[in-house]
Every structure is written in C-alpha cells, then in structure tokens.
Amino acid sequence: MVASVPLRNVSHLLSVLRSQNVPRYLQNGVPRDVLLFRHERGRFFAILGLFCAGQGIFWTSLAVAALSRPLSRVPAEAPNRSYQDLRSALWRYGLAVGCGTMGVLVLGAGLLYSLRSVRSVMLLAGGQQVTLTTYAPFGLGTCFTVPLNQISCMAHRGEVPAMLPLKVKGRRFYFLLDKAGHFPNTQLFDNTVGAYRSL
C-alpha cells in the first residue's frame, strides 16, 4: 500500500504534465508562425551606424594626413640627415598604421554588434524552423532561418542581467537578445529557442 501511493502520485503528475499546452503544442508543431521575442531599437542602431561611419572617416583622414605630409623638413646641410629622415618616416608610417587600426576596430565593432543584436525571433509553423532578424548597419535589418536544433541558448532568461546569448551552429560569435525586449510567449520560448543544446 505504501508503494502504491507514490506510484499514484507519479501517474497523477504525468497526467498533469501531459495536459499542459506547451508539450502537446511542440509535439504536433505550431500551427502558425509564433513571435517569441521582439525588441525595437532601430533608432539606436541608425545612430550607431552614423557614429561608426564618422569615426571611420575621421581615423582614415588622420592616416592619410600622416602619410601625405612629413612632420618636419630636414635641412640638406644638417648633420645626421639620414637618421632624422628615417625617424620622420617611421613616425609617419607608425601614426598612419595606428590611425588606420583604430578606424578598422571602431567600424568592425559597430558592424559586429549590429549584426549580432537580435531584433526578433519567430518560430515558424511546424515548430522546426526559427527566423532570427538582426539589426544590420544603420538599423536596416537582416534575417535568416535556421533549424531549431541548431540553436542553443547559453543561459536561462533569469540567469543573466542584460543580454541573453544564443549560439547558432556554423556561425561565429553569439547572437544577443536584450532582456529589455518583449517575450510574448515565455513558456514556448523557454522550451524551444531558450533551451540549451550541445552543438
């Protein structure tokens, strides 16, 4: 009799879990496209794109200016003229390389951040495909569709303070979901895109 009580409780628990909507929803596939996440920050990414473009132009113009004009003219009769010319050339080329590197880093960081920040996540009808929409440079947006089994959420929504990292198989770097965004269907998100998978 004592052994039958836990068995009855377990069977009751299993029947309750089977009656929940989400597992049945996932087994049969979703009948239509379901929005799982949305976060609109198009204006921010437009400003970020303009800032990065301005920084790229600024650092490139500094590099061109460093290459085009020598810092100082060395008189022809000056002693050690060849040493001073070398120092001036090394200084100019070093400054040009440094400025060019700064411009490339700022542009690359802005481009990477805008391409990896997620605007929306849509679970397509059938429940086997997911469409991720990211902010492209200047907030123009780009989207791609991947199978659900190729997406892994690296942390639960409650574990991270600001950004939720998503790993997509075959793509470098994580995709970032801002927790300030809207999760219209949290239970379905946690059971599909928000689940951890070893890729």
Curated annotation (Swiss-Prot):
Residue ranges that the UniProt entry lists as topological domain Mitochondrial intermembrane: 65-94
Compartments, as annotated in UniProt: Mitochondrion inner membrane
Keywords tagged on the record: Membrane, Mitochondrion, Mitochondrion inner membrane, Transmembrane, Transmembrane helix
Principal subcellular localization: mitochondrion
Transmembrane segments: 44-64, 95-115
Mitochondrial matrix side: 1-43, 116-199
Covalent S-S links between cysteines: none
Cellular component, GO annotation: mitochondrial inner membrane; mitochondrion
One GO-annotated biological process of the protein: mitochondrial cytochrome c oxidase assembly
Keyword Isomerase (UniProt): no
GO molecular function annotations of the record: mitochondrial ribosome binding
Family annotation (InterPro entries): Tmem223, TMEM70/TMEM186/TMEM223
Domain of life: Eukaryota
Topology class, membrane: Multi-pass membrane protein
Function in brief: Mitochondrial ribosome-associated protein involved in the first steps of cytochrome c oxidase complex (complex IV) biogenesis. Stimulates the translation of MT-CO1 mRNA and is a constituent of early MT-CO1 assembly intermediates.
PANTHER family, sorted: TRANSMEMBRANE PROTEIN 223
Subunit structure: Associates with the mitochondrial ribosome.
Family: Belongs to the TMEM223 family.
Protein name (Swiss-Prot/TrEMBL): Transmembrane protein 223
Organism: Mus musculus
